[in-house]
Amino acid sequence: MPMDKPEYAAFPLDITVRFAETDQMGVVHHSEYIVWFEAGRVAWMAAAGMPYTEIAGAGYNFAVTDLQCRYRNAIRFGDAVQVITRLGALRSRQVEFIYEIRNPHTGAIYADGHTRHICVDGDGRMTRVPDWVAQRLLGKVKGEAYSANA
């Protein structure tokens, strides 16, 4: 079931940078971007009607196998950011998510990247993405933007 690079609906997650997320230089620590990617991914999945808790409750997980983050501009304490997440690709055993961290007022990109995940069962063995999960993840396409209130 290869689905290479169609434009799926984006889900925006608004975040205000907390002091604890900054480093000694007064900018957001590089590790926080990855935490925000995860928060965006979990929120995207919930908005798609596929809460991660439901997947895990059914005995499946998505193990991270690849992660890339390109840092483009510094973010500081108190800044408003928006993590925009979309499905990048869905294959029989792999899911990819694409992320942009933007300034919600100017649209400036602070960072972008992706994560790739392998579907694993409760014993940690690689398995196919269940059809019921794939169907829900594929449920929205470009032009059908997710709402934070959905």
How should these model regions be labeled?
Residues 2-13, 46, 75-77, 87-150:
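HotDog/MaoC-like acyl-thioester-processing domains
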Residues 15-19, 71, 119:
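Hydrophobic residues in beta-strands and at strand termini
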Residues 20-23, 40, 50, 57, ...:
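Residue-level signal for pocket-adjacent positions within structured domains
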Residues 44-95:
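Hydrophobic beta-strand-centered segment that forms part of the acyl-chain substrate-binding groove
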Residues 2-47:
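Catalytic strand-loop segment that frames the active site of acyl-thioester-processing enzymes
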Residues 33-36, 63, 98:
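Residue-level recognition of specific faces of alpha-helices
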Residues 14, 29, 63, 70, ...:
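Conserved beta-strand segments that form the floor/walls of ligand-binding pockets within enzyme
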